[in-house]
């Protein structure tokens, strides 16, 4: 399978994907990038966004990631995401509930509370995830 790229997507919670693919497109902090088999090695950071896994010209898997790192080596591409979800497993209703719960917690915190930044970051991630589901 020398004509395929080995791709792994890992979050702190679990490995979301590992397999041989044709092409991966990911949201780098310097811009979206694509990786094919035999790509030149590099490492970069990721921003929140959708990782698309292609077989031929068809997107077979979509994952929403919250930051992390992408490492391209001769062995393939590994993405270590701060948080990631398979978009085929996510539901808009569940995400809406999570957003509302986070917003309610945010209202309970004082303006100077350090937990506010964590909640605001989580709300931003969830809203991006919700937007990715709509597309």
UniProtKB/Swiss-Prot annotation:
Instruction: Report how it sits in the membrane.
Output: Peripheral membrane protein
Q: What is this protein called?
A: ATP synthase epsilon chain
Q: Give me the Gene Ontology terms describing cellular component.
A: plasma membrane; proton-transporting ATP synthase complex
Q: How does it assemble?
A: F-type ATPases have 2 components, CF(1) - the catalytic core - and CF(0) - the membrane proton channel. CF(1) has five subunits: alpha(3), beta(3), gamma(1), delta(1), epsilon(1). CF(0) has three main subunits: a, b and c.
Q: Mind telling me which InterPro entries this protein's record contains?
A: ATP_synth_F1_dsu/esu (IPR001469), ATP_synth_F1_dsu/esu_N (IPR020546), ATPsynth_dsu/esu_N (IPR036771)
The gene that this protein is the product of is atpC
Q: Does the keyword field hold Signal?
A: no
Q: What does this protein do?
A: Produces ATP from ADP in the presence of a proton gradient across the membrane.
NCBIfam families hit by this protein: ATP_synt_epsi (TIGR01216), PRK00571.2-4 (NF001851), PRK13449.1 (NF009983)
Gene3D superfamilies assigned to the protein according to its UniProt record, in alphabetical order: F0F1 ATP synthase delta/epsilon subunit, N-terminal
User: Can the keyword Cell inner membrane be found in this entry's annotation?
Assistant: yes
The entry assigns this protein to a family as follows:
Belongs to the ATPase epsilon chain family.
Pfam families, per this entry? ATP-synt_DE_N
Keyword tags: ATP synthesis, Cell inner membrane, Cell membrane, CF(1), Hydrogen ion transport, Ion transport, Membrane, Transport
Query: Chief subcellular site?
Result: membrane
Q: Name one GO molecular function term.
A: ATP binding
Q: Which domain of life is it from?
A: Bacteria
Q: Where in the cell is it found?
A: Cell inner membrane
């Amino acid at each position: 399978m020398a004509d395929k790229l080995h791709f792994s997507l890992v979050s702190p919670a679990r490995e979301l994907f590992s397999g041989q693919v044709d092409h991966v497109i990911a949201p780098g902090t310097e811009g979206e990038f694509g990786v094919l088999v035999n790509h030149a090695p590099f490492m970069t950071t990721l921003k929140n966004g959708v990782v698309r896994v292609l077989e031929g010209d068809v997107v077979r898997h979509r994952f929403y990631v919250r930051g992390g790192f992408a490492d391209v080596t001769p062995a393939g591409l590994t993405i270590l995401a701060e948080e990631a979800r398979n978009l085929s497993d996510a539901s808009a209703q569940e995400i809406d509930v999570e957003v509302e719960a986070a917003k309610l917690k945010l209202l309970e915190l004082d303006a100077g509370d350090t937990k506010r930044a964590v909640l605001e970051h989580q709300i931003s991630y969830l809203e991006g995830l919700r937007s990715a589901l709509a597309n």
